[in-house]
Structures are given as C-alpha cells and as structure tokens.
Amino acid sequence: MRFRIRKCPNCGRYTLKEICPVCGAKTKVAHPPRFSPEDPYGEYRRRWKREVLGIEVRK
C-alpha cells in the first residue's frame, strides 16, 4: 500500500487521509499525473482545454 500525500481543496492543508481532519472535506491527490511521451489521451485533453478556453487552432 502506497501512501500519497493529499490536499484539501477547501482549506489547502496537506494530509494522508481521504477526509480532511480540519474541515471534513474530501481530499485530492496532490501529485500530478505521470508524464508519458506516448500519451494516448493527450490530444483529447488538449482539444477539451482549447474548447473550454475558447482558443482557436491555427492550421
């Protein structure tokens, strides 16, 4: 079992627990996803981000 440090999105405190001991909110893993040059979903993620931010793609 690997412990990953987690962060509370409400109060910003770090903990190893799934529930924040200070405010009781559900915590999120503080580590970014692992990088891979052969990312199979990278194009979809970039396309979604462009749509959300309203960025036009040059061709």
UniProtKB/Swiss-Prot annotation:
Swiss-Prot/TrEMBL keywords: Ribonucleoprotein, Ribosome biogenesis, rRNA processing
Pfam families: Nop10p
GO molecular function terms attached to this record: snoRNA binding
Signal peptide annotation: none
Example GO biological process: pseudouridine synthesis
InterPro entries in the cross-refs: H/ACA_rnp_Nop10, H/ACA_rnp_Nop10_sf, Nop10_arc-typ
Domain of life of the organism encoding this protein: Archaea
GO CC annotation: ribonucleoprotein complex
NCBIfam families per UniProt: PRK13130.1
Family, similarity comment: Belongs to the NOP10 family.
Known function: Involved in ribosome biogenesis; more specifically in 18S rRNA pseudouridylation and in cleavage of pre-rRNA.
Name recorded for this polypeptide: Ribosome biogenesis protein Nop10
Record lineage: Archaea, Methanobacteriati, Methanobacteriota, Thermococci, Thermococcales
Gene that specifies this protein: nop10
